[in-house]
Structure formats: C-alpha cells, structure tokens
C-alpha cells in the first residue's frame, strides 16, 4: 500500500510540474490565497445565511479555471516562448492580486477593520497588472 501511495504521489508531482512549472513561492501564494478566498467567502455566506452549494461549486469552478490559466501561461513560456516564466508569473501575479482583494472584501463584509498597507499593496499589484494589460492591448491594436 505504501508503494502505491508513493507511486501515486510521484505521478501527481510530475503532472503538477509539467502543468504549473513546479511549486515555487508564487504558486504557494496563489494556492494559499485561493483557499483563503474560498473559506472567507463561505464564512460570509454562513454569517449572512446565504450559503449555497450552487454558489460554492461555482467558486470551486473558478479556482480550477485559474489553475488552468496558470498552466496555459507555463506551457506558453516553456514550449512556445522557449523558457523563462514571464507568462506564468504574470498570470499568477494577476490572480494573487484578485484573490487578495477578494479576501479583503470578504473581511469587510463582516465589518473587520482592514490594514491600509495591505489594501495599498494589493491595489498596487492589481493596478500594475491592469497597466500591463492596457499596454498589451495597445500593442495588439498597432
């Protein structure tokens, strides 16, 4: 049984490395933020008596799609652009900012005071991603 568990773990690690480029600090941060966002969203729904399995499933589906987009970024970097981690890092940074802001919004829904510095850092990260998206849009218009 131990051999089966070890083999399964090795296969899953290989798939994860191929799909997402291995577990680094960025990916750990994204996964942590996604879990925290889901949990805080559920807590808000419980407190407001709006808990719904349909909405919960939609939240999980969004998280799966975020991971699919990270995989797209990694595969583009590795197999199309010839190395590096530009696309993967940009995708992860974008979703770290979104998930972080969502966590703050969930906390705000429960009237929890929010640290101004944390708000500023996440907004700065988000605005940096928005600026890069605008630059890309203008480049493609040319």
Residue ranges and their predicted role:
Residues 46-55, 106-114:
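A cytosolic-side transmembrane-helix exit/cap motif
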Residues 20-26:
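Transmembrane helix interruption/hinge and helix-loop junction motifs
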């Amino acid at each position: 049984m131990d051999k089966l568990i070890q083999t399964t773990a090795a296969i899953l690690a290989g798939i994860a490395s191929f799909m997402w480029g291995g577990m680094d600090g960025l990916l750990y941060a994204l996964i942590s933020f996604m879990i925290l966002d889901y949990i805080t969203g559920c807590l808000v729904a419980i407190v407001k008596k709006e808990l719904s399995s349909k909405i919960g499933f939609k939240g999980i589906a969004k998280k799966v799609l975020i991971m699919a987009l990270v995989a797209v970024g990694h595969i583009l970097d590795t197999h199309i652009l010839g190395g590096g981690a530009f696309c993967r890092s940009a995708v992860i940074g974008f979703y770290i900012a979104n998930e972080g802001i969502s966590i703050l919004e969930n906390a705000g829904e429960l009237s929890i005071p929010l640290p101004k510095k944390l708000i500023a850092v996440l907004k700065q990260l988000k605005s940096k991603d928005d600026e890069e998206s605008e630059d890309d849009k203008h480049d493609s218009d040319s």
